[in-house]
Amino acid sequence: MKEVSITDDMRKRARLISNPDVVFNQNKTGSRAGYIGALGEIVVADYLGVKPHNNNEVYNYDMVWNDNNIEVKTMNLYYPPKEGTDCCTTTYYDQKCDMYFFVGLLNDKSKAWIEGCIYSKDFFKKANYIKKGTTRSDGFTYKWDNWVVKVKDLSSVDKVLSNTTGLDTFL
């Protein structure tokens, strides 16, 4: 897991690519979702050294890295993520990406964690289907049907970034 301090520049760039006027079906945080998601995209794009999309581009993925279409999923957190933290996407979305990167974003937007990454084909093999209305042991209740893996199921982004023999070695 890679911890990242959020800078004012990152916040500014996230506001530029987010669209606060759009509230997508099945998002978890209402109109804030665009900004939260954009901030997660900025974190991953900066780490990978690529450019994220802008708010008029691409539904199926957020950026391209090493010929892989990357979709970033960001979750607002009140505490740093752990190995057992959920990484999920709602079943509503049918995005056509090659890889998912998962980011945990501290509620005050001061820090983020790139929790890991996984090829989309492997995500759906490993993910558990969680039905709307299911309540976790910590009291959180899912508002939508979700596909869920844990942080421990993801590949380390440091290993993926340093790998020169092909991504399949680590994913």
How does the language model describe each region?
Residues 1-66, 73-171:
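Nucleic-acid endonuclease domains
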